[in-house]
Amino acid sequence: MPSLPPSKREILVFEPDVEGHSQEWLQHLVDFVAANHQAAAIAVLAPPALCATLSRSIPPVADGRIRFIAMKPSEVKLCGHRSLSLAAFARWWTMRRYLQRSGADMGFFLCLDLLSLPLAFGLGTHGKPLAGILFRPSVHYAAFGNYQPGLGEWLRDVRKDLLYRMMLRNPAVAAILSLDPFFPAHAADHYRHGGKVQALPDPAHPAADSAGAVVSADIVPPGRIAFLLFGYLTERKGPLMVLDALRLLPQRVAARVAVLFAGRVDPAIRDAIETRRDVLAREQPDLWLRIDDRRLDRAELDSLVTQSAVILAPYQRFVGSSGVLLWAARAGRPVLAQSFGLVGRLTREHRLGLVADSSDPAKLAAEIERMVDGGPQTFIDLSSAADFASSRTPHRFASAPATSPASPPPGRPATRR
């Protein structure tokens, strides 16, 4: 039976998380579907607060092709369980149940990584095809060069390799969209059904109207070089290593920099940040440091990125891509990023700034000093950065999920489970 054209289908888009990119990426999908009548209709299955926020932004031209389904509190709790295995099976079960209830033609996981476990067991959704976005493949990092995984990372990659291999054999899995542009080639070379893996561009944020932003034009003291770390500040994002590195700066360098942390601080590290902040105040009195512990809107972030000289991305051996690179590239600002993994490779290949072993405060401090002494703009290729950002648009990002294949490849029909 031939597949329905996209405009006659409905895709159930499932996202149980509210932190990170969830709202922003769902907004891209909503905007794309509203503006493109040939795209599939979407039903967004998400926590109530996220549904309420997104529903207020539906353009009038959507013409009933976008609807929202609020998850029950118990479902949100199970899908976010601390046991990742339990959360994975809860997400699969929730998708299976709502696909049947909603009448949607296929299911799409905004984040597929956890689902590799239940899908590797061959679990399906009543014969309806599934697709989703894979954020953190790492099994191909050896091809990046100088990859020396620890035992835990090696075991993680062995586990991922097995799960990916088995997941791709699942006839219910129609497509996997990878935010890592290098993983599809690896999948095609190493997995029997690797052709299901396709590259998906991480979307650069469109420029916001900053007229209403409440960011002062002189937030950074004049004469200082501003370093900005923004987003939801977890330990993995590197704020503690940055504070440790700032202690090691020569006094002459500390007197020339301004460091701003902008974004909600993870409660788990709030005390550690305050302790380091107190130490810095004693040991580096000439250093300017500000921590703005709150969620900032897009216009505020646009303004802060534009005002800053360097954007910090000192992740701690983080696997996957980072929207921070796109914010910086679009604004023409160099990054100081981790050397590890995809973030490091993209920074080097597209000449977006400098990389460092960000798990070592001394090496991070050395690169901060280098950027201050050499001038931040000498470490970015503005033309390459502009090309990097322009090739990763919200439209390109949203068009892939909204036009996902409606059925698995011919010859491998989805079984009913």
Where are these predicted regions, by residue range?
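A conserved mid-protein helix/loop that constitutes part of the nucleotide-sugar donor-binding site
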Residues: 23-28, 234-248, 271, 326
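Glycosyltransferase donor-sugar binding loop
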Residues: 45-51, 230, 258-274, 290, ...
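Nucleotide-activated donor-binding/catalytic signature segment of Leloir-type glycosyltransferases, i.e.
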Residues: 65, 272-299, 303
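Membrane-proximal helix-turn-helix segments that form the acceptor-binding/catalytic region
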Residues: 93-100, 138-140, 148-176
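Active-site proximal beta-strand in glycosyltransferases
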Residues: 106-109, 122-147
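Conserved donor-binding/catalytic core segment of Leloir-type glycosyltransferases
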Residues: 219-237, 243-246, 259-261
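Acidic donor-binding loop of glycosyltransferase active sites
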Residues: 303-320
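Short hydrophobic beta-strand element within catalytic cores of glycosyltransferases
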Residues: 310-311, 334-338
